[in-house]
């Protein structure tokens, strides 16, 4: 769907393998997520990158004709463009020419809601602009970009100074936000609250699953990057109090600058006790492998141990029994724990939450001896901090409360009760 009749032309420069077709399909979805309709496509099967245009001269002429015919607002390249290539292509076609990186930034800018995500996007854009400006100046000095330095060296220096100062201010503000987040994470641990983070390739159904697990009714549109800021809600998994967090979706070959910019958002994932890596099993096996590899690469680079990851094969209602068996073998071959669900149909949710409970770290159980008055006072705190498995009448008139939770929290509750026995 287009927004206000806006359109974009997709250009894929070098198709050198089968995986490129999947990236092309993904680019179509990104274009639509940015609010454009795909007016036309131009493909070139070549490993050679023309230094001036990225694509061959003949393809440039085809592109000009396509632009004249379709009259798009802009042209989008799958391949990364160098500053001189974007400049030359724009000059030839008469419209703005961007690459996949800039398209993703545009989507992020449209969907940013929180102050943090807006700052992160601005930071990534400014760093991109600064690197491009440096290259533009080098090209202008060599006479390849006529008129670029028309404002004089003073104007260029002023631009550098402004952007550099703005980058420093944003980074300082993000450091403060990061510190507040880390303090919040520490308070959660102090309170004994287990944390579960939903991650996965964009479009896998994370937000649908988040809504099912937490009873929320959050924003779902099926487009890439519906979630940019983290959203957390408290709930219970089989009696255990947990905080479930929905995080930004991954994408293949996400630029390092964007990963760096969204560090504070991804930090929520690193701090989680269990990471649910959601996959769309209605994809082809090749697509599932590609998306799993891309997602695992981000998680491992963040320092997430594989033992904390639970693969969640979503959308099982969209595949046949034979296809599901094939997908299950694929997940099994990953060597990670996995479970199969349909978030939309609420199939397999009980098994999913049970698997999460089994993975929660440092669980111990203990028996607390409490008077009825003490239990009445402490019941809310007990339920907020751990699972209450059983309450029975003791021989001395006290109530024996069997609880299960984090080791340090259970030990603290035991100390307050004045007695207790750790069962395991």
Swiss-Prot record:
<feature type="binding site">
    <location>
        <position position="207"/>
    </location>
    <ligand>
        <name>Mg(2+)</name>
    </ligand>
</feature>
<dbReference type="GO" id="GO:0043022">
    <property type="term" value="F:ribosome binding"/>
</dbReference>
<dbReference type="InterPro" id="IPR025121">
    <property type="entry name" value="GTPase_HflX_N"/>
</dbReference>
<dbReference type="Pfam" id="PF16360">
    <property type="entry name" value="GTP-bdg_M"/>
</dbReference>
<dbReference type="InterPro" id="IPR030394">
    <property type="entry name" value="G_HFLX_dom"/>
</dbReference>
<dbReference type="InterPro" id="IPR027417">
    <property type="entry name" value="P-loop_NTPase"/>
</dbReference>
<keyword id="KW-0963">Cytoplasm</keyword>
<keyword id="KW-0547">Nucleotide-binding</keyword>
<feature type="binding site">
    <location>
        <begin position="200"/>
        <end position="207"/>
    </location>
    <ligand>
        <name>GTP</name>
    </ligand>
</feature>
<dbReference type="Pfam" id="PF13167">
    <property type="entry name" value="GTP-bdg_N"/>
</dbReference>
<dbReference type="GO" id="GO:0005737">
    <property type="term" value="C:cytoplasm"/>
</dbReference>
<keyword id="KW-0460">Magnesium</keyword>
<dbReference type="GO" id="GO:0046872">
    <property type="term" value="F:metal ion binding"/>
</dbReference>
<comment type="similarity">
    <text>Belongs to the TRAFAC class OBG-HflX-like GTPase superfamily. HflX GTPase family.</text>
</comment>
<feature type="binding site">
    <location>
        <begin position="342"/>
        <end position="344"/>
    </location>
    <ligand>
        <name>GTP</name>
    </ligand>
</feature>
<dbReference type="InterPro" id="IPR042108">
    <property type="entry name" value="GTPase_HflX_N_sf"/>
</dbReference>
<dbReference type="GO" id="GO:0003924">
    <property type="term" value="F:GTPase activity"/>
</dbReference>
<feature type="binding site">
    <location>
        <position position="227"/>
    </location>
    <ligand>
        <name>Mg(2+)</name>
    </ligand>
</feature>
<dbReference type="InterPro" id="IPR016496">
    <property type="entry name" value="GTPase_HflX"/>
</dbReference>
<comment type="subunit">
    <text>Monomer. Associates with the 50S ribosomal subunit.</text>
</comment>
<keyword id="KW-0342">GTP-binding</keyword>
<dbReference type="GO" id="GO:0005525">
    <property type="term" value="F:GTP binding"/>
</dbReference>
<comment type="function">
    <text>GTPase that associates with the 50S ribosomal subunit and may have a role during protein synthesis or ribosome biogenesis.</text>
</comment>
<feature type="binding site">
    <location>
        <begin position="314"/>
        <end position="317"/>
    </location>
    <ligand>
        <name>GTP</name>
    </ligand>
</feature>
<feature type="binding site">
    <location>
        <begin position="246"/>
        <end position="249"/>
    </location>
    <ligand>
        <name>GTP</name>
    </ligand>
</feature>
<keyword id="KW-0479">Metal-binding</keyword>
<protein>
    <recommendedName>
        <fullName>GTPase HflX</fullName>
    </recommendedName>
</protein>
<dbReference type="InterPro" id="IPR006073">
    <property type="entry name" value="GTP-bd"/>
</dbReference>
<feature type="domain" description="Hflx-type G">
    <location>
        <begin position="194"/>
        <end position="364"/>
    </location>
</feature>
<dbReference type="InterPro" id="IPR032305">
    <property type="entry name" value="GTP-bd_M"/>
</dbReference>
<dbReference type="Pfam" id="PF01926">
    <property type="entry name" value="MMR_HSR1"/>
</dbReference>
<feature type="binding site">
    <location>
        <begin position="225"/>
        <end position="229"/>
    </location>
    <ligand>
        <name>GTP</name>
    </ligand>
</feature>
């Amino acid at each position: 769907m287009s927004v206000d009749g806006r359109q974009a032309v997709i250009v894929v420069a070098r198709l050198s393998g089968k995986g490129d077709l999947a990236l092309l399909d993904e680019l179509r979805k990104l274009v639509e997520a940015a609010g454009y309709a795909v007016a036309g496509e131009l493909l070139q099967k070549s490993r050679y990158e023309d230094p001036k245009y990225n694509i061959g001269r003949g393809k440039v002429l085809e592109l000009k004709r396509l632009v004249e015919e379709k009259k798009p607002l802009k042209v989008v390249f799958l391949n990364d463009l160098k500053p001189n290539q974007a400049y030359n292509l724009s000059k030839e076609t008469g419209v703005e020419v961007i690459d996949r990186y800039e398209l993703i930034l545009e989507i992020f800018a449209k969907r940013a809601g929180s102050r943090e995500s807006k700052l992160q996007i601005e930071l990534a854009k400014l760093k991109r602009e600064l690197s491009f400006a440096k290259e533009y100046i080098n090209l202008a000095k060599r006479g390849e970009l006529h008129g670029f330095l028309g404002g004089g060296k003073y104007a260029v220096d002023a631009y550098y100074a402004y952007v550099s100062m703005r980058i420093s201010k944003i980074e300082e503000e993000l450091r403060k936000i990061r510190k507040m987040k880390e303090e919040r994470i520490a308070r959660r641990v102090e309170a004994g609250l287990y944390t579960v983070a939903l991650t996965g390739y964009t479009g896998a159904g994370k937000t649908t699953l988040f809504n099912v697990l937490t009873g929320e009714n959050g924003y779902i549109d099926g487009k890439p990057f519906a979630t940019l800021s983290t959203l957390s809600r408290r709930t219970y998994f089989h009696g255990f109090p947990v905080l479930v967090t929905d995080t930004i979706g991954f994408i293949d070959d996400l630029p390092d600058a964007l990963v760096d910019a969204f560090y504070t958002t991804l930090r929520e994932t690193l701090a989680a006790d269990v990471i649910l890596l959601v996959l769309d099993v209605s994809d082809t096996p090749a697509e599932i492998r590609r998306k799993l590899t891309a997602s695992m690469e981000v998680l491992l680079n963040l320092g997430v141990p594989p033992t904390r990851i639970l693969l969640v094969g979503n959308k099982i209602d969209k595949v046949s029994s034979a296809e599901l068996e094939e997908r299950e073998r694929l997940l099994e071959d990953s060597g990670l724990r996995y479970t199969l669900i349909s978030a939309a149909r609420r199939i397999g949710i009980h098994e999913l939450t049970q698997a999460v409970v089994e993975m929660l770290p440092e669980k111990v159980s203990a028996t607390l001896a409490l008077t009825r008055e003490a239990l009445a006072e402490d019941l809310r705190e007990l339920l907020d901090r751990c699972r209450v498995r059983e309450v029975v009448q003791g021989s001395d008139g006290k109530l024996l409360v069997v609880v299960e939770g984090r080791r340090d929290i259970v030990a603290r509750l035991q100390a307050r009760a004045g007695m207790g026995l750790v069962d395991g």
